[in-house]
A protein has these predicted regions:
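Structural motif
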Residues: 21-23, 126, 155-158, 187, ...
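Extended, hydrophobic alpha-helical segments in both membrane/secreted and soluble proteins
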Residues: 158-159, 175, 186-188, 194-197, ...
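Conserved structural-core and active-site-/substrate-pathway-adjacent residues in large, well-folded domains
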Residues: 25, 67, 115, 157-160, ...
Length: 337
């Protein structure tokens, strides 16, 4: 690792000065935990005897939860339905100390829910209730005005798109204009169908599959060394020219991440994960940690290493997990032993 232990501690301390606004699709992550000891006589599937249930913030709300866990202030901008799942989501947001001032409840709309059944520390099945909120012209105008106000009151913005309808040209343009006016850095986690404004963004964090799709070229088998992966480097070059971000981070799962920047060669950060139980939300951890680290004064390499370490903590847990500042500090210390 290039980052020194002293700098890790200093950056984490500076996280507390930040106030991050997370804009995106909100959903409820519901976990059913149990024990498996036999197969069903009805079908070749395991029977899970339920021991516990837990609701967690999902989607963009999990990004905010990650930011909060690292010590920063966090506000959420998004929509929920006027249903029990929406109320459950508000309850877990409050329990986690996340500001829901900019969360709007839409009547006659259902909240997206993703339920995961975990049997003996292994995910057995995931069940999704996907819903897109109905955003009429009146609501859209109010949301744009609210987005401008929220952006002016934060130190950084994360646009977390989960393809559920909130991230649209009008809201994104309003946020980017307000961010430029207030000199607020914006980080974007784009999905494969992203075709929205990207003017002036600081960070973009697609995964490998998304990067190839957004670059418009076919995905190839990964090379052993990402810096020798010609197709990946071509996708990176295309996206740097297309979006013009300060930093492009392509997350590569077990291979870590590739980081591209202007006028300098890209660099590769290997994964620091020691155990992998669940990759749910690892990308949320990366974008939140990157923005916080850069805002705290870390350079490109230091920020990428911190983000990879935080992701290493998260994938070693079951469920939509987070990494605290203390865990991040301990993880980086353990890597040096």
């Amino acid at each position: 690792m290039h980052i020194s232990p002293q700098n890790v501690k200093s950056f984490i301390a500076k996280f507390r000065r930040q106030k991050i606004l997370v804009v995106g699709d909100l959903m409820l992550d519901r976990y059913i935990y149990g024990h498996v000891n036999r197969l069903s006589p009805e079908a070749p599937v395991p029977i899970v005897r339920v021991r516990d249930e837990k609701n967690m913030p999902g989607g963009a709300a999990n990004v905010a939860r990650n930011v909060k866990a690292l010590g920063s202030g966090a506000s959420i901008f998004g929509l929920i339905g006027s249903d029990q799942a929406g109320r459950d989501l508000l309850n877990v947001l409050r329990a986690d100390g996340l500001s829901s001032t900019y969360v709007t409840t839409v009547n006659k709309t259902k909240t997206t829910v993703k339920m995961r059944v975990i049997g003996d520390r292994q995910q057995v099945v995931r069940v999704d209730w996907d819903n897109k909120p109905a955003i009429n012209d009146g609501l859209l105008k109010k949301m744009c005005l609210k987005a401008v106000k929220a952006t002016a009151q934060c130190t950084g913005v994360i646009l977390a798109d989960y393809a559920k309808g909130l991230i649209c040209p009008e809201i994104v343009s309003s946020i980017l204009k307000a961010a430029r006016r207030n000199k607020v850095p914006v980080a974007v986690d784009p999905k494969v169908n992203w075709n929205l404004p990207m003017d002036g963004i600081a960070i973009a964090t697609p995964n490998r599959k998304e990067a190839f799709s957004l670059a418009g070229i076919p995905e190839t088998e990964p090379a052993r060394n990402p810096l020798n992966d010609r197709a990946l480097l071509r996708a990176s070059d295309i996206l740097m020219e297309k979006w013009n971000p300060s930093l492009l981070i392509i997350t590569l799962g077990a291979q870590g991440m590739l980081v591209a920047r202007h006028a300098r060669p890209p660099f590769h950060v290997t994964t620091f994960a020691r155990e992998v139980f669940d990759v749910s939300g690892a990308g949320d951890t990366v974008i939140g940690t990157m923005l916080l680290a850069l805002s705290a004064g870390a350079n490109d390499i230091e920020a990428a290493e911190l983000a990879n370490c935080a992701a290493g903590v998260v994938v070693g847990k079951i469920g939509t997990a987070t990494c605290s500042g203390k865990e991040l500090l301990e993880f980086t210390r353990d890597l040096r032993r």
